[in-house]
């Protein structure tokens, strides 16, 4: 058995030396040291030897097993190190190569305008107020002095949900809710989404508005003009011309449309401004006394003004966008310009 053990030892050492990968070394391990391995078989055969030879032969078998196992482990570690070194050599990072830039998103032009308008009015002492988009008829129409027969109540203009609930057609209901909760003075803007049954190059069934309200004692039309002139000059530039034209809104009296000098032609007249030199940007006026009565304010002691603008229209004028539908198409080629 001694000769057989030495022969097996030499064979195992030769097999280990010939192995170049972890897989080959594992095969050698199984062949000699596994449950059915050759060295394991010798250990099981010790029982057939005379009793006086068993300890010596058993010690020799264990010595060979330890030697083979240690050499396999040593060779395995060396094979792993060589494989790692080879992989590192082929996967080496060239730190001189330029880095890959991350794709950066940008804010939507509507969001940019809302933030800029809100910041301007914050500087004028206005705070932001919000309200529900599904609104009750009373807040959206009646409290704002819209009589039941007013055309804005027609199905072609308003999305009715059920009974007296509807999708708000403007953010004016936020003004009503604020005045019902808060006594004068009031100075708020109400940005938000509104809905109307209309869709073409300059209209959308869903769009955004910012409306404003200022209520206090002795608020005058001159205050309204001063606030809006300051706003337009900050938004479009200090040299932007501003004019107010008489108009009509059920919830304000007197009412006005606010125009700015055409941002395309500078007021000289072009296709965009229809040769007038002016572009309408918002509506405004002094709050009608009837609206104050609806919210429990005394129109004899307080006064105020309100104004409202479409954010998409402001964005189109500010960024030179010709079709409002571009703002809702989610075309990255368009949006990444902002």
Swiss-Prot record:
<keyword id="KW-0030">Aminoacyl-tRNA synthetase</keyword>
<keyword id="KW-0460">Magnesium</keyword>
<keyword id="KW-0547">Nucleotide-binding</keyword>
<dbReference type="InterPro" id="IPR004188">
    <property type="entry name" value="Phe-tRNA_ligase_II_N"/>
</dbReference>
<dbReference type="Pfam" id="PF01409">
    <property type="entry name" value="tRNA-synt_2d"/>
</dbReference>
<keyword id="KW-0436">Ligase</keyword>
<dbReference type="InterPro" id="IPR006195">
    <property type="entry name" value="aa-tRNA-synth_II"/>
</dbReference>
<dbReference type="InterPro" id="IPR002319">
    <property type="entry name" value="Phenylalanyl-tRNA_Synthase"/>
</dbReference>
<feature type="binding site">
    <location>
        <position position="253"/>
    </location>
    <ligand>
        <name>Mg(2+)</name>
    </ligand>
</feature>
<dbReference type="GO" id="GO:0005524">
    <property type="term" value="F:ATP binding"/>
</dbReference>
<dbReference type="InterPro" id="IPR010978">
    <property type="entry name" value="tRNA-bd_arm"/>
</dbReference>
<dbReference type="GO" id="GO:0005737">
    <property type="term" value="C:cytoplasm"/>
</dbReference>
<keyword id="KW-0067">ATP-binding</keyword>
<dbReference type="Pfam" id="PF02912">
    <property type="entry name" value="Phe_tRNA-synt_N"/>
</dbReference>
<keyword id="KW-0963">Cytoplasm</keyword>
<dbReference type="InterPro" id="IPR004529">
    <property type="entry name" value="Phe-tRNA-synth_IIc_asu"/>
</dbReference>
<comment type="similarity">
    <text>Belongs to the class-II aminoacyl-tRNA synthetase family. Phe-tRNA synthetase alpha subunit type 1 subfamily.</text>
</comment>
<dbReference type="InterPro" id="IPR022911">
    <property type="entry name" value="Phe_tRNA_ligase_alpha1_bac"/>
</dbReference>
<dbReference type="GO" id="GO:0004826">
    <property type="term" value="F:phenylalanine-tRNA ligase activity"/>
</dbReference>
<comment type="subunit">
    <text>Tetramer of two alpha and two beta subunits.</text>
</comment>
<dbReference type="InterPro" id="IPR045864">
    <property type="entry name" value="aa-tRNA-synth_II/BPL/LPL"/>
</dbReference>
<dbReference type="GO" id="GO:0000049">
    <property type="term" value="F:tRNA binding"/>
</dbReference>
<dbReference type="GO" id="GO:0006432">
    <property type="term" value="P:phenylalanyl-tRNA aminoacylation"/>
</dbReference>
<keyword id="KW-0648">Protein biosynthesis</keyword>
<dbReference type="GO" id="GO:0000287">
    <property type="term" value="F:magnesium ion binding"/>
</dbReference>
<protein>
    <recommendedName>
        <fullName>Phenylalanine--tRNA ligase alpha subunit</fullName>
        <ecNumber>6.1.1.20</ecNumber>
    </recommendedName>
</protein>
<keyword id="KW-0479">Metal-binding</keyword>
């Amino acid at each position: 058995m001694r000769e057989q053990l030495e022969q097996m030892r030499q064979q195992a050492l030769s097999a280990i030396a010939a192995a170049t990968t972890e897989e080959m070394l594992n095969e050698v391990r199984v062949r000699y040291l596994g449950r059915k391995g050759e060295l394991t078989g010798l250990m099981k055969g010790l029982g057939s030897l005379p009793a006086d030879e068993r300890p010596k032969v058993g010690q020799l078998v264990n010595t060979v097993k330890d030697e083979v196992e240690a050499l396999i482990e040593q060779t395995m570690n060396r094979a792993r190190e060589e494989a790692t070194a080879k992989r590192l050599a082929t996967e080496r990072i060239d730190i001189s190569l330029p880095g890959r830039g991350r794709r950066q998103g940008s804010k939507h032009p509507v969001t940019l305008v809302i933030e800029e308008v809100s910041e301007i009015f914050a500087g004028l002492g206005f705070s932001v107020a919000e309200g529900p988009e599904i609104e009750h008829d009373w807040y959206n129409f009646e409290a704002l002095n819209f009589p039941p027969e007013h055309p804005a109540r027609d199905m072609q203009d308003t999305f009715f949900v059920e009974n007296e609930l509807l999708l708000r057609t403007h953010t004016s209901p936020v003004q009503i809710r604020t005045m019902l909760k808060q006594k004068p003075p009031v100075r708020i803007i109400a940005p938000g989404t509104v809905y109307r049954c209309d869709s073409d190059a300059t209209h959308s069934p869903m769009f955004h508005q910012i409306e404003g309200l200022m209520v206090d004692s002795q608020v005058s039309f001159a205050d309204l003009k001063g606030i809006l002139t300051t706003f337009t000059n900050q938004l479009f530039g200090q040299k932007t011309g501003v004019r107010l034209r008489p108009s009509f809104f059920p919830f304000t009296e007197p009412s006005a449309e606010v125009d700015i000098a055409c941002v395309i032609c500078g007021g000289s007249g072009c296709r965009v401004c229809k040769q007038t030199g002016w572009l309408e940007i918002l509506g405004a006026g002094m709050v009608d006394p009837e609206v104050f009565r609806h919210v429990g304010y005394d129109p004899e002691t307080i006064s105020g003004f309100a104004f409202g603008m479409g954010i998409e229209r402001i964005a189109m004028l500010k960024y030179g966008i010709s079709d409002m539908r571009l703002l809702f198409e989610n075309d990255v080629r368009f949006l990444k310009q902002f």
